[in-house]
Amino acid sequence: MISVTGIGIISAIGNNTTETVTSLRLGRSGIGEVRYLNTVHHSLPVGEVKMSNDELRTLLHIPAGTFASRTTLLGVHALRQAIADAGLSVGEISARRSVLISGTTVGDMDVVGHSNVIPQWSLGRETRDMATLCGLDVEVCTVSTACSSSLNAIILGCEMLRNGEADIVIAGGTEALSLLHFNGFRSLMILDSHPCRPFDATRAGLNLGEGAAYVVLQRSSEAGHTRAFIKGYANRCDAFHQTATSANAEGAYLAMTGALRMAGLQPADIDYVNAHGTATPDNDLSESRAIRRVYGKLDLPISSTKGMTGHTTSASGSIETVLCILAMENGFIPPNVGWHEPMNEGILPYVGKDTVSLENVMCNAFGFGGNDSSLVICRSGEEGTLRKTAGHSGRGEADEHCGRDEADGHGGKTCEETARHSVGEIVSDVTIDNVEQLKDVGAFIPPMAARRMCKLMKAAMLTSLRALRESGLETPDAIVTATAYGMRENSVKMLNDLLEYGEETMSPTLFMQSTHNTIGSAIAIQTKCHGYNITYTQGEKSFEWALRDARRLISTGQAENVLVGWHDETDDGGIFSRSLILRK
């Protein structure tokens, strides 16, 4: 069993857990006029943290000369809270097999939006910076699956603990408002000019927010004290479209049912669902359909807290995990602020209720590309009845001894050596390192579709589909992607336009194809893969993390085969794409 032993949070509704509980109980929204983001679009409300960068630096005792983006500052603030809440010292954490796993999409882009320097978009640097500023000497990992990033960070942390790869994991996510993603969402025409209204008939879009939240995770047998237990989780893919969801919300449905199955719970056992609930017409309708598929006609309390915090994108999953834990501890259901009129085919959200007992809670986080994840959080550490018989994935129980004698997670070998010789067999391995090799993409992708792809996407598609064909597969069980810099070509184009021409020029097409999980989700869409889907972006360590995950999926029986890819543009404008199939 996995225990949450510490929590930390900062968002538009509070700089700590005490302030956050007060805001939740009062239904106090943190959404308002732009104050700190230097944008021309002041008519669009946002959920900003109520502190400037200078105020955050002063609070955190970070010297002015030390580089730290707003994303980093928010993350450090929440991290320090979580560590203190767990009753652990930095020295104790550093002396154990400990890991910091963070989810983000923006990274340091809030700094770039105010400079003439376009960096290599390395999200992994931000996670390393946070560890350094917190004094942590630990392994670091960055997950980037858009709006499900931080929930997937928590899932990864639980998996590492269950399989003996770590003793302490600090997992969550951080995201600051930036001109890049603010105008990117604006280009998609999904930002509301009024405070958002999740699941309301008049909903007209989301309000972006910012913040950070982290949880300290430990095996329950080693936990000093426990605030909550994480019993179930699932990461699935809708495999439909980069920004839209399928009509029956297959990814969301699979994530929720998978989390329930792992927890050993029936739908009737869940006392509250914290919905993703972005207030966009598409999300709220599809999520309502998915919830009805899972829970039927159960009179189940459901609400979205984004009417208070705004949509904190990559940080939303961990922020809402902490909100769920606070609601469980204090006996209330967070209100669905802004809701007044039922929507057609929609769920009826709770507007808030005090004095309730919440034993089992589900938290949803759904991202661009159909990267959908769900988490089941419980007050009791007792095993669910289904879990005892069904196993973790339905394919067999995890090997609880896997990796326990491996201090660095791969026994001193490189991860590739471990993947080849310890768990699984590489049955196909395809590499492209020259743009000229892209001429073969027509054998796999129609010309019209290929014309809309940047060169890195073409390379990733070509190596992935060729590896699948060589291994005799059409659809992999899981897709694990590594990329140090993501869709750099598209990102640089957007940043150049933003810096040279201003905020009115953002291309919605480029924005949709700029997130680090674009490649993994596009491959899932192409191959109709609804299984586990994650993207690692930790610099030169990205591929190692991907191989470790693929190995874990196979050793725990969660997958028979995994498509693992490493896709990056080189500094000289070239490309490198490698895809392999790891099979049991």
Question: Could you tell me what each predicted segment is?
Answer:
Residues 156:
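Internal active-site segments that recognize and position negatively charged phosphoryl groups
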